[in-house]
Amino acid sequence: MLNIKTKKKNKKRIYVFNKNPEFKFKHLVFQKNKFILKIINEIDKIDLMRSEIFNSTLPIDPQTGNILVRFRKLNRNRLLAIKAIIQAMLYHFNIKTKKVTASVEQLADECGLSTVSKSGNKSITRASRLISQFMEPMGFIKCKKIKTTNNKFSKEIILTPLFFMILVKNSSLSEGDTHLKQEFKILKNKNVHINSSETFAKQEILKKIINKYSLNKLKKLGPKKIKEKINTEYKNIKK
């Protein structure tokens, strides 16, 4: 009797199916705001990993308002994915309403973050988790559930001032030519209020609070008391 030895193949589990997600838009002229187009084109020059806002902002659970103790930070794969998502959100951004005019599924498709199984089932989990478990708790976006015509729920995405702050603070975009500066002023006037001095000052105060207290103490304080401390400290500075 022959002893046939079978070699077991070491199959590595694939955690990320597309390691290099990239935003690919269909219509070149959809977004006409020159300032936003410049951000889209120069997203690779923005160093999000070293961002003071990224490193000092406390993630807040949008449902409960509590600080998220266990929170997944950016790694290389998530960084590439978030840059692609940022580009897509900006591309579909309506300045008047502050809303993204694309669904999560559309954003996932355009960024290469959606997958289709062998059975034909589509998954947009990677994009939806990035939006609901990272961008929203960090305060970069706000999500609202809306009822669609087929009685299902979809997410309405609103870009916050912090979303733009992180992009402008970590790039040379604010040092651009006069025309782009004018575009940025127009963008601010159209209900996207970005008070850079106040926001930056409050982020610095927040950073000091984080360094001063332990994680358990911060959790006990809660977002409301932390916000009160920040506002009190900011008023004292302005006196």
UniProtKB/Swiss-Prot annotation:
| Similarity comment | Belongs to the IncFII RepA family.
User: Keyword DNA repair, does the record have it?
Assistant: no
* Top-level taxon of origin: Bacteria
Name of the protein in question: Probable replication-associated protein repA2
Q: Which gene encodes it?
A: repA2
Keywords annotated in UniProt: DNA replication, Plasmid, Plasmid copy control
- The answer on whether this UniProt entry bears the keyword DNA-binding reads no
Q: Name one Pfam family in it.
A: IncFII_repA
Q: Which NCBIfam families match?
A: RepA_IncFII_LM (NF040977)
Q: Name one GO biological process term.
A: plasmid maintenance
Primary role: This protein is essential for plasmid replication; it is involved in copy control functions.
